[in-house]
Amino acid sequence: ARMRIQFERTGGFAGMRVATTIDMESLSADEARELREMVDAAHFFDLPAVIKSPSPGADQFQYKLTVEAEERRHTVEASDAAAPETLQPLFLRLTRLARRG
């Protein structure tokens, strides 16, 4: 099953932008499986499009994540503080992948 992930992180103290587009076919089988499991664990396709924080801080990271799988496409925007715990590991992993280039 094909899956594509577009990921962007902005904000933080330095205001650095980290962005990447990941085609699952370009990853190792283990990495692809792990990412897919993280997307499933977060119930990503059921999440609201915008997850707002009750206390928005200017130096928080903002995340924008789009996942395309089969006929489905869903985008979620969330701040660090607002992101549900199920999304945190996915954001961390994608940030690492984005930095790896």
Give the predicted meaning of each segment.
Residues 1-101:
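Function-determining sites in protein domains
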